[in-house]
Each structure stands twice: as C-alpha cells, then as structure tokens.
Amino acid sequence: PSTRLSQFSLNGEARDYKGDPFKRLANALRDDFALTGTKVGCDAGDCGACTVLIDGRQACACMVAMAQTDGCEITTVEGLSSAGELNPLQRAFLHHGAAQCGICTPGMLMAATELLNREPEPDRTSVEDALGGVLCRCTGYQTIIDAVMDAHTFTEATPARHHGPSVGSRLERIDGVAKVNGTDQFGADSAPADALWLRLYRSPHARATFQVGDLGEFVAGSDG
C-alpha cells in the first residue's frame, strides 16, 4: 500500500505519521499514537463521539484522512489537561455529573472547548448549537449544557466534591476523572498481547452469482 508522511502538531507536540494516507484520523490516533480517548461510534460522522479540534475547529476524526492532517494543529481530549490537572471545563463536567457512560464525553468536551475559546461565557442557545453534532444517550443533555455554561466559574484549583460516605450529598463519580481526561478504558481501547484478531473481507462485487464447484479436492486436502 502507498504511504505518505504527514507532519502535524498533536496536543502541542510535533508528530510525524508515515502510513496509509487514507487511514482515518480517529483510527490513527488510537492505533498509531495510543490516544484512545477519542472514541469511534458510528464511524460515519453522525454521532460525534470522535470529535477533535483541527486548527481550533471541531471535526469528526472518523471523516478525516491522514493525508489531510499535514501541517495541522490537532487537539484531543488528552490535550485538555495540563500537568495532570483538569481544566475548568473538565472540572465543571465532574461537578454537574455530565460524564455518565463516558462514550460521548470526549466529543462533548472538544466541541465545548471550541465554543469556549470563542465565547468564554456562552448562553444556552450557543451551547446547544455547539454541541449539536455530538449525540448522548445517557444524560438528556441538561447536565452537559449546565457544565459548559458554568465552566467559566471553575479554575484548575477548584476542589473536587468530597469523596466518602456522605448520605444525602452529591458526590463526583469515582471514575469521573478518567472519563473526562480520556484515560478511561472501554472494550475497544485495549487488548491482551496475545489476542487473536479477525479481518473482515468484503466482496468487491455488489451483486454476484456464486457457483459452487467440486469441493472434493478441497475436502481431501483439509484436516477435519
């Protein structure tokens, strides 16, 4: 297969990619750069789970070929934290319980980041418009919208809610930090070193008639 060198900034660091120019950015982030915070949902640009920032604008990484990334500045959910400290938006997500199952969370954070870079104190309509390309099945969107609208009131130093036996008190999710910084591991994010992999082969013919010939020679040469 043909290869092409792409050079770009990834979360503030200069990176090189030499490989299939048609490989999707979402897959390259996960496979080649081990950044599994970017999730692949529909793989068709509909759900928005794979949203990243390219030159400051939100984009579905599953729809961007690596050949298009040369010279770009790419930011993923892993690039939001600084020195291990959550940024104000991530802290707002924890406070409002905006990260539930976590699949859409990275995409929501990146879409919201683009908005907040332009409008630090957006109104509800602006937030709804900015998040319109990212689908969520858990939250009903209200907590996410609240978090984005309140993000300007948080800082990196905003203390977390108390963790412990506090009956009647609102607590942050135990796994909340991992969900908002992109380190939470889902089924497709890791595999044992000795895992067996399957490859799906599709017929190049949309409509074809198959004729089964004599299988005797094949059966004779096959064990079992």
What residue ranges belong to the model's regions?
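Signature of N-terminal electron-transfer/Fe-S-associated modules in redox systems
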Residues: 1-162, 168
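Flexible, low-hydrophobicity surface segments
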Residues: 152-224
